[in-house]
Amino acid sequence: MVFADFLEKIKSLFAKTKDPITSMSPPQENRSPKAEYLNNFFNTNPTNGKSRGSQEAPRKPLGQTNLNVQGSMPAKKEGFNRVLDGLKKRQLQHDFKLERAAETYEPTQNIGSGAFGIVCEAVETSSNQKVAIKKVAHASATPTLARRTLREIRVLRYINHPNIVPLRDIFRTKGPLGIDVFLVMDLMQNNLHHIIYGNEDPLEEHYINAFLGQLLRGLEYLHAACIAHRDLKPSNLLVNQDGTLRIADFGMAKCADNSSKKHDDEEHCYYMTQHVATLPYRAPELLFVLPEHSTAVDMWAVGCIFGEMVIRNEILPGRSVQGQIKMLLTMLGQPPQEVINEVRCDRTRKLIQDFGRKADAEWDDIMFCKARGDDQIVRGNCDTIDFVKQLFQYDAQKRINIQDALLHPYIQRVIPAEAPQKKCPFRVKKDMMQVEDLNHQELISMMKQDVRSAENPITYSELHSGDSTGSTSDMSTNTSGEYSPIAQHEQLLEDVATQISICEPTCDL
């Protein structure tokens, strides 16, 4: 039995549902309980509203608004809807001014937004295929935004993994505050956050196992190249109706190699720590502003996501940094002294020390879901409890890494082993490390170069040259034109991965 069997089971069940985004029909009486459960699974109009401690409410069905028009006046209601539709269309046109790229992509509706970007659904005119376009506005306005944008571009452009969202195209336009960058990716029907809270019942165990397995496989691919995502959460895990999960939103991704420390001060300032990882999924080293961040921050987030799927609630639903720290101390007790000694902020250190040593809570109680009744996933299961404990270690060095997680008895039991997967090209790590040593102007020049250089197919001479990006002086020239597409060359990527994996170094974090 292979891991693909889990996906086949999900696909066969999800095939009974309607379009998870546009379907708003009420459940039919003759529908089987399993089909009804799956229909609610992708229902974008959950009845339970916003979950306790959740910072993101499930989105409403497309076209539905918060405006409630009372009375029997359908004409007025239709008039309101026409006005609202017009405002939405104008906002979409304002947000996604694609200029020359409008000949290739036609935006149809806004579907999401985050701290540093907005996303719309669009149609590729040549193939009539639906895609998602992420806009990073003012990408060149500050060194931090420019560096983040370059990181995301450089992570995604050579990635080729079924559990990581693929980059189909990229282009840029001139915005009011510099360069606006647009990333074109496959459109996914939903995300894990909506799946968890889109139904009154908690997820069944085989769904949890399948989603957890795909998440770990995607992280194995990234962590092999020392790439830390740093913003894992259910809303950044996209899910198709066939059950395929893909990791998305690499705006916070960073090379976690210990040799890259030049911009530690920038990455660890108060402003940055408010945006690296959403609060309920933020690892202790981020909360405590410790000197180093490694791929271990992703493993902490895996524990939070796993727990959220089990209990249908956030494990640590903090509302502020201080509240999150207190909640963490209540659950896990006081950190080891060696961790406290590494805390830079005096106020944070005092808060930890003043909290005192209290007995940490039992995982049987933390991961208990009343709605599951006697069918608990964690309670009484020694392997599961041990797996969770190893994910929630204060000390990042003692926290379980991705390789050991895949070999853990719990994972081995619930997720059948797969054949060794293709390794992440070492070029991804190399390109990410180059970004860290550039000033603002060099970042802008490299951003233009990265987008424009992708107009032409990548040759082997460029791949194996000492500096494929060119010198800074070369990058600052020939910058006319606003639209620069990237073509996907899947066979070339496979050949490159095969060539590079022969001499690829290992990274133990």
Swiss-Prot record:
Q: Which GO terms describe its cellular component?
A: cytoplasm; nucleus
Q: Superkingdom, according to UniProt?
A: Eukaryota
Q: Which UniProt keywords apply?
A: ATP-binding, Kinase, Nucleotide-binding, Serine/threonine-protein kinase, Transferase
> What InterPro entries is this protein classified in?
Kinase-like_dom_sf, MAP_kinase, Prot_kinase_dom, Protein_kinase_ATP_BS, Ser/Thr_kinase_AS
Catalyses which reaction(s): L-seryl-[protein] + ATP = O-phospho-L-seryl-[protein] + ADP + H(+); L-threonyl-[protein] + ATP = O-phospho-L-threonyl-[protein] + ADP + H(+)
Which residue intervals define the domain Protein kinase in the entry? Answer: 105-411
Look up the EC number in the record and give it: 2.7.11.24
Q: Which residues form the active site?
A: D231
Kindly list the cofactors needed: Mg(2+)
Its EC top class is transferase
The Gene Ontology biological process terms listed for this entry are: cell population proliferation; dauer larval development; determination of adult lifespan; intracellular signal transduction; nematode larval development; organelle localization; parturition; positive regulation of cell growth
Q: Identify the stretch(es) annotated as Disordered.
A: 19-72, 460-482
Residue ranges annotated as compositionally biased, kind Low complexity, are 466-481
One GO molecular-function entry: protein serine/threonine kinase activity
Q: Phenotype upon knockout?
A: RNAi-mediated knockdown results in an approximately 50 percent reduction in number of offspring.
Q: What is this protein's tissue specificity according to the annotation?
A: Expressed in intestine with a stronger expression in the four most anterior cells, muscles, excretory cell, pharynx and, to a lesser extent, in hypodermis.
So where does ATP get bound? I111, G112, S113, G114, A115, F116, G117, I118, V119, K134
Q: What does this protein do?
A: Serine/threonine-protein kinase involved in the postembryonic regulation of body size, mainly through control of cell growth. In particular, controls the volume of intestine, muscles and hypodermis. In addition, regulates growth, intestinal granule distribution, lifespan and number of offspring.
Tell me which family the UniProt entry assigns to this protein. Answer: Belongs to the protein kinase superfamily. CMGC Ser/Thr protein kinase family. MAP kinase subfamily.
Write the protein's name. Answer: Mitogen-activated protein kinase sma-5
Q: Which organism is it from?
A: Caenorhabditis elegans
Gene behind the chain: sma-5
